[in-house]
Amino acid sequence: MGFPKVERLLINYKTLDEFKKFKGCGAQELSMLEELQANIIENDSESPFYGIYYGGSLIARMSLYMKRNGGEPFEITGPYLELYKLEVLPTFQKQGFGQMLVNHAKQMQFPIKTIARIHSAGFWDKLNFTPVSVTDGDFYIWHPETNLNAVTNEESA
């Protein structure tokens, strides 16, 4: 078995079955089942889902959306990525799989916006994200131009 790597997940019923393993492992807000089902119905060929397979099973996943214009009340101008619903199955947590997913997004060299969920502030801080507070909630931002050395060869997926 080779070293696990991040890959874009196919939008199909096999992926839907894999997502069911995550149900009940985290908060309802992390559920991607409905989102995946909607993409299957719409036959959306550009999957926003990325994951890591280990031993033939999906063990970690995230949604990644390209946004065309920052325009919101934060320090992003132009295109950026929104990273949603990063989740690693409990058995595989604290082994670097979440970091692998984030580093995959960082390699695209766009600013990244994410919302810290369920006691994850330390995780985002460790990965050089900056906390931002606005009236409608808190989130974290990573800027590639100020973090050129943040993804090293050892960290990259």
UniProtKB/Swiss-Prot annotation:
It is an enzyme of class 2 (transferase). It holds the Pfam family Acetyltransf_1. GO terms for molecular function: acyltransferase activity, transferring groups other than amino-acyl groups. Its EC number is 2.3.1.-. The keyword Ribonucleoprotein does not apply. Keywords: Acyltransferase, Transferase. The keyword Acyltransferase applies. It comes from the Bacteria. InterPro entries: Acyl_CoA_acyltransferase, GNAT_dom, YlbP. Residues 9-154 form the N-acetyltransferase domain. NCBIfam families: PRK13688.1. This is Uncharacterized N-acetyltransferase BCB4264_A4022. It comes from Bacillus cereus (strain B4264).
